Amino acid sequence: MAREFSLENTRNIGIMAHIDAGKTTATERILYYTGRIHKIGETHEGASQMDWMEQEQERGITITSAATTAQWKGHRVNIIDTPGHVDFTVEVERSLRVLDGAVAVLDAQSGVEPQTETVWRQATTYGVPRIVFVNKMDKIGADFLYSVGTIHDRLQANAHPIQLPIGAEDEFNGIIDLVEECAYMYGNDLGTDIQRVEIPEEHKELAEEYRGKLIEAVAELDEEMMMKYLEGEEITVEELKAGIRKATTSVEFFPVICGSAFKNKGVQILLDAVIDYLPSPLDVPAIKGTLPDTDEEVERKSSDEEPFSALAFKIMTDPYVGKLTFFRVYSGVLNSGSYVKNSTKGKRERVGRILQMHANSREEISTVYAGDIAAAVGLKDTTTGDTLCDEKSLVILESMEFPEPVISVAIEPKSKADQDKMGTALSKLSEEDPTFRAHTDQETGQTIIAGMGELHLDIIVDRMRREFKVEANVGAPQVAYRETFRAAAKVEGKFARQSGGRGQFGHVWIEFEPNEEGKGFEFENKIVGGVVPREYIPAVGAGLEDALKNGVLAGYPVVDIKAALVDGSYHDVDSSEMAFKIAASMALKAAVSKCNPVILEPMMKVEVVIPEEYMGDIMGDVTSRRGRVEGMEARGNAQVVRAMVPLSEMFGYATSLRSNTQGRGTFSMVFDHYEEVPKSVSEEIIKKNKGE
């Protein structure tokens, strides 16, 4: 089967936003107008095409990014709908890694919200070009220019409107196109009756002012246009479009458009903007990778002629076909039934069938080309972030980095029958989601699951019940504390057992010191003159790594420290790797008294939105939870409080906020960083963990 759409006419885009800004509805409408759905599903009725898991339909939020493909004006648009809820950041991170461009959806009443900032940061990390769609223009309190202002203030992004709304709230009935200098008026709410008209008289002045600002902003990034602009020459529509496209694809400029997906206004113009301004796979830099044997860096161009390479970015378990591996093809061509190499794991895999996904229905295809996104059936060993490539031309593409879980709960099956099923369920779920971990606690024998937040773990337990029929009891959430050292010291660890027969002997001197935040554990060998033989040195490092898993104060993992092996001694007969491992862990225990160990706790960036009259109560409540208020602002007729609060103090906050504001307050939180626990709290944690 020949290629249906050329690479230049392919767009791989993500739709990203804060929860409830209306992303899924926007995606639905795109599928409706591109002829993929015959009836529109509403999220708030639980009938949306993209939200296909039962819990998504019940909760009205998107959890897994469904990948789907649509066609518009001779172009193929592959869309990944990403979740906006903070607990699912990994889904967003995964999608952004394989996209070429994104549409950031904002709520016209709130503008940029905390999760928008997180997602925006992730997109900046991966260098993803973006268009901003200010949605919900029909909502009470909708304010387009306020929303644009929040993009400048909170994201420090060079964003400029390329459209202006005509009216707002109930009066929102048209859109001014600043590039083409015309207006589109909507005759009905189905979005089918659109008239292209001249800009209404009363809006002309504003339109001229903003078109001037737009040209100036684009000209600043384009020398030729700048010369024309300064000489007062007319800049044509084509030149302006080309200028916007160039600046957008190089991530220096973000066009802002408006509409109301729910009321079917502005969606077709959004699709036009995706085609006009977001990059094709040819416009983005070629993907970089390394050769497995030499670690030499290589590039794979987006072309069918290059050897095949692809990145697996999501694993899903499908009730009918089993394990689905979603992948993005960066170069070359892949036929179903062929063999590929998983270069990350060094395994050979057979691609049984290739499916093109459409929210939750699928169509089987025989070939995928460079730039395509599809799902493969039959891959056994491939997990998220693995590279698939041609067996004759190996390459490992840059993988993705995922955050560590911040919250854990103990979970136990209700019956013996559930016990076995639970193991299978947990391993399948952790295969799908790299930020979800499950392990057995060595001391208590309990199964512990860990994730990115309470909602994340709720949904995992819920999926165990629905998809794997496992009933389980869940304990109270536990915070993922960490420990670290604040002072440097040189300590000794000596393990000697020499009572007849073969003994054990290991002896080390280790210098511990604090490391930079986020750098983790670093081990250095500074032994001179072989006082500790070379073959035992890895054992010292391994012994320390093992010992660091259970910290010295309260048994939490120790992070961000440096250890240098500086001296020691050995015995010709009695020394062994095991003895040096034990000596190293003894040195770590000895460091407690000298290195000033402290406990660290996860701090959450919290944003609370409340009516003015509850301000005092909420501020008091935040402070009582050891929170630091970092800023306040008015947003429409509500107040927004931004604060840093320890995760341990945020359990049950939703209930307390509801009762403090009679259900009128909302909040969202995002993990930010680890911080030292105050002395009094630290003592309590130590007591609790020692069972006192």
Swiss-Prot record:
PROSITE patterns: G_TR_1, G_TR_2
GO cellular component terms listed in the entry, alphabetical order: cytoplasm
Binding site for GTP: 17-24, 81-85, 135-138
Location in or out of the cell: Cytoplasm
Molecular functions per Gene Ontology: GTP binding; GTPase activity; translation elongation factor activity
GO biological process, one term: ribosome disassembly
Alphabetical UniProt keywords: Cytoplasm, Elongation factor, GTP-binding, Nucleotide-binding, Protein biosynthesis
InterPro entries from the UniProt entry: EFG_II, EFG_III, EFG_III/V, EFG_IV, EFG_V, EFG_V-like, EFTu-like_2, G_TR_CS
UniProt domain tr-type G: residue ranges: 8-282
CDD domains documented for this protein: EF-G, EFG_III, EFG_mtEFG1_IV, EFG_mtEFG_C, EFG_mtEFG_II
Parts forming coiled coils: none
SMART domains on file: EFG_C, EFG_IV
Subcellular location, principal: cytoplasm
Alphabetized Gene3D superfamilies for the sequence: 3.30.230.10, 3.30.70.240, Elongation Factor G (Translational Gtpase), domain 3, P-loop containing nucleotide triphosphate hydrolases, Translation factors
Family: Belongs to the TRAFAC class translation factor GTPase superfamily. Classic translation factor GTPase family. EF-G/EF-2 subfamily.
Function field: Catalyzes the GTP-dependent ribosomal translocation step during translation elongation. During this step, the ribosome changes from the pre-translocational (PRE) to the post-translocational (POST) state as the newly formed A-site-bound peptidyl-tRNA and P-site-bound deacylated tRNA move to the P and E sites, respectively. Catalyzes the coordinated movement of the two tRNA molecules, the mRNA and conformational changes in the ribosome.
HAMAP family: EF_G_EF_2_B
Protein name stated in the entry: Elongation factor G
Species per Swiss-Prot/TrEMBL record: Bacillus cereus (strain ZK / E33L)
